[in-house]
Amino acid sequence: MADSHGDTGATMPEAAAQEASVFSMTDVVLFSLIVGLITYWFLFRKKKEEVPEFTKIQAPTSSSVKESSFVEKMKKTGRNIVVFYGSQTGTAEEFANRLSKDAHRYGMRGMAADPEEYDLADLSSLPEINNALAVFCMATYGEGDPTDNAQDFYDWLQETDVDLSGVKYAVFGLGNKTYEHFNAMGKYVDQRLEQLGAQRIFELGMGDDDANLEEDFITWREQFWPAVCEHFGVEATGEESSIRQYELVLHTDIDVAKVYQGEMGRLKSYENQKPPFDAKNPFLATVTTNRKLNQGTERHLMHLELDISDSKIRYESGDHVAVYPANDSALVNQLGEILGADLDVVMSLNNLDEESNKKHPFPCPTSYRTALTYYLDITNPPRTNVLYELAQYAADPAEQEQLRKMASSSGEGKELYLSWVVEARRHILAILQDYPSLRPPIDHLCELLPRLQARYYSIASSSKVHPNSVHICAVAVEYETKAGRLNKGVATSWLRAKEPAGENGGRALVPMFVRKSQFRLPFKATTPVIMVGPGTGVAPFIGFIQERAWLRQQGKEVGETLLYYGCRRAAEDYLYREELAGFQKDGTLSQLNVAFSREQAQKVYVQHLLRRDKEHLWRLIHEGGAHIYVCGDARNMARDVQNTFYDIVAELGAMEHAQAVDYVKKLMTKGRYSLDVWS
């Protein structure tokens, strides 16, 4: 009460003073408003008088916009063969380019095309072009999935009922027999086009990357073109010849700000990073941790942590992180030296076909050093078409003959290529060293070499626990070839050398992006999970376990969590040993089962432990609705594990083998048996 009395107890002189103060303030405010309004009126009226009369903006002409009709482009440029490619690592694109280049030998003109850049509904108009043919080089990614650039095409094929009568086509698929869904994309495209009324003019080709993909392609190609000639009534105009696709332009006086320094897409994108980040716009992540995981000296297994703060990159447990590596500077320098080239010359390789969407084989202008370091694959054995093109530069007739033989489709040539190049793992530098007379111009070599591709790793962390970092688990690849050379993995050697930020005053940066995966924990946290991941195959399960531990901390009920892990010896390469022991101790891991393959006389693998626990596993699968996850080697481990589950289901489910196989296949269809494997 005293406070309220105090509020009204002012004397008359004080009240008068307050009133005068209020009136003077009101005057000031009113005066300011009037002045402001007058000023605004004069200023903005004047500006409005200067605005030109509005005129309708003309729409850009069809030639200035991105062409979505590949048929119109074919008509405009006189092409009658289009080769579409679904490519994740660049191989399918390379094959498509080779096929489109072949066409000129038969009096035809071809073009390679990315289905992501065109409206594939235009296929129905293809018969408007005389002797038109659509070829599809389709790679299968992961577990029967389309590649990123073919996803829209795949979706369209599933949804459309367009009539493709009169469309002539052929398909070559790229796959790997160690995977469950071998060449699924190639098979689907081939079958679906026929269902829509298109006419297959040559049988489906299926390349196997687990064997010899290059030989599979050559064998299919040498039978494909005679079938095309017979169907369209044309003849080959001559032998395969060397035709340059790009012309060299040297930049002797160019602003360095206009020169690419390793960026994958937009110039200066590494200096001015803008989301969203993807394959064409990777994020430069700082390496904050790079530690060796194992105790042994025979191999180097490592754990890296990449800082993705402020990138707006989101990921989930089970996703993949892709990194763009750089070639070893020593190899690059040796290439420059053996070719007698100045690697710091700035140049551009410009497509001679002005109508092509692909203006350069890699970002240009750039230096030879940058191209060989960041853009070109210099460590994988070159394909036969590269050897064929290089042969013309061999001064020694014997060396030229050998190169042409290896590039041929003869049985002897294929065998020589397989043994001398593929099995001996000879990269381009090794070939130049072994053939002293072979010295191609560096610009032509840069045109011929394939692009250096991103490397994918299963993310070894959970975004619930580590929202601002992505973790990688990898083994440094290093081996001696049959020729006695020491070869090193491009990406793992590069990652191994990345020192965490702050250790030497600088930042170790990794261009990266995240690729979504179907390898996901069950929607219901109470669903049991059975994880099988020997070696670095444990990576995604570290993320899974972290996430389940986080859920438990949030008070959620979590189902049984079983891990079957395998390594050689406990003291040598037991990855994440302390972390896994901690998860077992706190109850997140219901079971931690470790198979040591070299700890005892008789080797023990993860499938042996699965057989040991068959009753419990069957109960979890059949009654508990458990989800099974397998990560690691596709060639042996994944197949053996799958066969083990067939046996468990057959025995404890009282089924015939065929019934057990069908049971497991249905688990896969329902998303209860997931694979994240590689070969």
UniProtKB/Swiss-Prot annotation:
Q: Which residues form the FAD-binding FR-type domain?
A: 280-522
The Flavodoxin-like domain covers which part of the protein? Answer: 81-225
Give the record's GO CC terms: cytosol; endoplasmic reticulum membrane
Give the cofactors, semicolon-separated.
FAD; FMN
| TM ranges | 22-42
Q: What class of enzyme is it?
A: oxidoreductase
Signal peptide from the UniProt entry: none
Task: Provide the GO biological process annotations.
Answer: response to hormone
- Which residues are involved in binding NADP(+)? 299, 536, 597-598, 603-607, 640
Instruction: Tell me, in one coarse class, where this protein mainly resides.
Output: endoplasmic reticulum
Cite the cofactor comment: Binds 1 FAD per monomer. Binds 1 FMN per monomer.
Which regions face the Lumenal side of the membrane? 1-21
Q: From the UniProt record, list the reaction(s) this protein catalyses.
A: 2 oxidized [cytochrome P450] + NADPH = 2 reduced [cytochrome P450] + NADP(+) + H(+)
Q: What is the E.C. number?
A: 1.6.2.4
Question: Which PANTHER family does its entry note?
Answer: NADPH--CYTOCHROME P450 REDUCTASE, NITRIC OXIDE SYNTHASE-RELATED
Give the protein name, as stated in the record.
NADPH--cytochrome P450 reductase
Native organism is Oryctolagus cuniculus
